[in-house]
Each structure stands twice: as structure tokens, then as C-alpha cells.
């Protein structure tokens, strides 16, 4: 469970995240590992890709790059983007999933009366900040998070986590980066369904991986429809 309101971080594990999603109330999506961002490796990923979840090491180069991007997004209209602020340390994995679910609800319905269904109904008209505060009080999500979180040998290790989850989604023909530490979403570029994965891969390569050449603690997951469900 949480220690001093600090959660134990999730792992970038497709099977674990799928089981976590099912218990939360979204069984129509699944996750597959992305092993690299050259076209040959991306060609192996089943289409259509709905989103990309990305885990990366936090460092000054990336923070500086992202701060620059943020300034370019101040005039964007984000009324059509579901967003939540992160206030709980190490909750970024769950925040990324909430961003995923919130922006794909029109295509992949949540299980009725599930934990997610109840949460989204409650926070639907709230600001991103109030949604983040509401998550702090949601014991159902917290308990499920810790049912599927990573294992740590020393509980004090959860204080020193320096990796972070974000998610990339396509909304109205644009690639949107959703990061709960930021004040608003980040718009990167125009794309389309066929090119979304490849365009997102280039963003990740240029704006994240190239900034951390000495630290290879990266992990990426493609989000695709579960074989048992059709897209609405």
C-alpha cells in the first residue's frame, strides 16, 4: 500500500497493465511491447494503434525540452482533450492510463458501474486540478494500483524513483502528449491513423531518447484493440 501518500510505481509490463485495466473496468484494450522505433520494428506492431505509453528517465535535458514545448502550446484549445493533474508521487502509470481511458471512451466504452465508470462520471465536469485531487481520495483505484504495482526490495526505494510515464494519443488529427506533471496537454504535430505510431516514434526518438544517450531506461507500449472487441 501507499507509504506516506507515496504510491509504489507501476512497471511497464503489458500483461500486468492489461489485468489492471480489466479490474479497473476497461477490457477492450491491450498492450504490446515496442522494441524499437525504426520502421522495421514498428511494422511488427498490430494496427490500428490507439495510443503509445512511454516510460523514460527524468533528466534536466528532457525537462528543458518539454518546458520549451509547453510555451508553444499556450494558445491551443484543449476543450476536446481529457486531462488530469498528478499530485500523488509515483502515480504516473495510473495517470497515463486515466489519460488513455479518458480520451478513448468514445471508441472503447468502459464497463458499466466499474471503478473507472464511477470515477469518470464523478469527475467529468471537473477541472484537471480537481480531478487530480479527487484521485487522491479514491481508495478503489489506489488499492488496485498497488495490487499490480512493481515489487521493491526496500520500501524506501519508492522515494527515489526517477522514471516517468506519459501517453501519446491522436485527437482530431494531432498527436497529443499527456503528462500529469504539466499544466496542460502538449500538441506535437499532425498525423493520421496509419502514420500515428511512426510519427509518435519519431517524437520519442528526437525529444526523449536523443536527450538521454547515457541512460537507456526507456520502455514503450502500443495500445491496440483487444481481439475480442470491435471499435465503435
UniProtKB/Swiss-Prot annotation:
Site (Important for enzyme activity): 179
GO biological process: protein catabolic process; protein deneddylation; protein deubiquitination; ubiquitin-dependent protein catabolic process
Region (Interaction with ubiquitin) residue spans: 10-14, 163-165
Example GO molecular function: cysteine-type deubiquitinase activity
N-terminal signal peptide: none
Outcome reported for the amino acid change (mutating residue 92 to A): Complete loss of deubiquitinating and deneddylating activities
EC number(s) recorded for this UniProt protein: 3.4.19.12
GO cellular component: cytoplasm; ubiquitin ligase complex
Protease listed as a keyword: yes
Function: Thiol protease that recognizes and hydrolyzes a peptide bond at the C-terminal glycine of either ubiquitin or NEDD8. Essential for parasite blood stage survival.
Similarity comment: family membership: Belongs to the peptidase C12 family.
Name assigned to this protein: Ubiquitin carboxyl-terminal hydrolase UCHL3
The encoding gene: UCHL3
